[in-house]
UniProtKB/Swiss-Prot annotation:
InterPro entries registered for this protein in UniProt: Ribosomal_uL22 (IPR001063), Ribosomal_uL22_bac/chlpt-type (IPR005727), Ribosomal_uL22_bac/org-type (IPR047867), Ribosomal_uL22_CS (IPR018260), Ribosomal_uL22_sf (IPR036394)
Classification via CDD domains: Ribosomal_L22 (cd00336)
Name by which UniProt lists this protein: Large ribosomal subunit protein uL22
Taxonomic lineage of the native organism: Bacteria, Pseudomonadati, Pseudomonadota, Alphaproteobacteria, Rickettsiales
GO-annotated cellular components: cytosolic large ribosomal subunit
Length: 119
């Protein structure tokens, strides 16, 4: 069996209290971006969920540095995958004794950072 050289690290954030559509706006923005640039963009982003994405990205960078010994200056975000998680269903009372259902969506986020060669 051939031992493959692992030059990527991952991190995940599960059950984030935001819809996957809103989370994917931020995830698509940072895909294929250098980690240093993505951290700056997430710090000053007006989106509420950007703080959670930044924490997940910092976790992936820490995994790359501590577990694999990768150079953090050459890390690039290769994957930022957003998935649906559970849906909390709530009831909202309405007029004339009726009620409607409110769905509160949750999402999962998976980030992969890879060390790229300088060219």
């Amino acid at each position: 069996m051939v031992q493959e050289n692992k030059n990527f690290a991952t991190a995940q954030a599960k059950s984030i209290r935001v819809s996957s559509r809103k989370l994917n706006l931020v995830a698509a923005f940072i895909r294929n971006m250098k980690v240093s640039e993505a951290l700056v963009q997430l710090t000053f982003s007006p989106k509420r969920i950007a703080k959670v994405v930044k924490d997940c990205l910092q976790s992936a960078v820490a995994n790359a540095e501590n577990n694999l010994g990768l150079d953090i200056d050459r890390l690039v975000i290769t994957k930022a995958i957003v998935g649906k998680a559970l849906v909390m269903k709530r009831v909202m009372p309405r007029a004339k004794g009726r009620a409607t259902r409110i769905n509160k969506f949750f999402s999962n986020l998976y980030i992969t950072v890879t060390e790229k060669e300088d060219n």
